[in-house]
């Protein structure tokens, strides 16, 4: 609620004092001031600060995303590496079932996907749509990540999502991935 201010005639009224559209909810303020925003923006110094202040590296925000989800999605390798070394759970799932590997795979961050796999991330986990990280990489045509995931777990290409689709069924038109995923 806006703070009352004095009108020109001296009476007290309740006019909004904030600029319309420039308000933040408490939830948004928590995000901006927390480890999630630092990870999203690749601010390793702030992420280290939060961890040194005993912030749980796997603490989820209101949507279930952890700092590792945000760093993975945005390609911040050093932040991902630090979070994993600080005990972040690589397979934490959002309310929609996404893992950091899902996010890195969808966004095309091959080296982060490799890092997550080297820390034990499970490529067999599915989101609420039944999609694996391979589905997410294929959907966006990320050949390097598809190859990486199949080197790690070749049988992933036989996994069907909740709509009975294989990863190869999600390939963009004219994708060179057909041979890799459909064979």
UniProtKB/Swiss-Prot annotation:
Top-level lineage group: Eukaryota
InterPro entries from the UniProt entry: Ankyrin_rpt, Ankyrin_rpt-contain_sf
Modified residues (Phosphoserine): 153
One Pfam family this sequence matches: Ank_2
Keywords: ANK repeat, Phosphoprotein, Repeat
ANK repeat extents: 30-59, 63-92, 96-125, 129-158
Record flagged with keyword Repeat: yes
Keyword Phosphoprotein among record annotations: yes
Record-linked PROSITE patterns: ANK_REP_REGION (PS50297), ANK_REPEAT (PS50088)
Protein family: Belongs to the ANKRD39 family.
UniProt protein name: Ankyrin repeat domain-containing protein 39
Native organism taxonomy: Eukaryota, Metazoa, Chordata, Craniata, Vertebrata
């Amino acid at each position: 609620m806006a703070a009352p201010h004095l009108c020109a005639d001296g009476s007290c009224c309740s006019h909004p004092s904030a600029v319309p559209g420039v308000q933040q909810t408490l939830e948004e303020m928590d995000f901006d001031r927390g480890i999630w925003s630092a990870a999203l923006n690749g601010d390793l110094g702030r992420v280290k600060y939060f961890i040194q202040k005993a912030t749980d590296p796997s603490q989820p925000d209101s949507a279930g995303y952890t700092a590792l989800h945000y760093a993975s999605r945005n390609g911040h390798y050093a932040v991902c590496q630090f979070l994993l070394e600080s005990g972040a759970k690589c397979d934490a799932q959002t309310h929609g079932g996404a893992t950091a590997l899902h996010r890195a795979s969808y966004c095309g961050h091959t080296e982060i996907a490799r890092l997550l796999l080297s820390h034990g991330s499970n490529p067999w986990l599915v989101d609420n749509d039944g999609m694996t990280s391979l589905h997410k990489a294929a959907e966006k045509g990320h050949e390097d990540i598809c190859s990486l995931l199949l080197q790690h777990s070749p049988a992933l290409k036989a996994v069907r999502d909740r709509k009975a689709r294989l990863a190869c069924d999600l390939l963009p038109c004219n994708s060179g991935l057909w041979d890799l995923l459909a064979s």
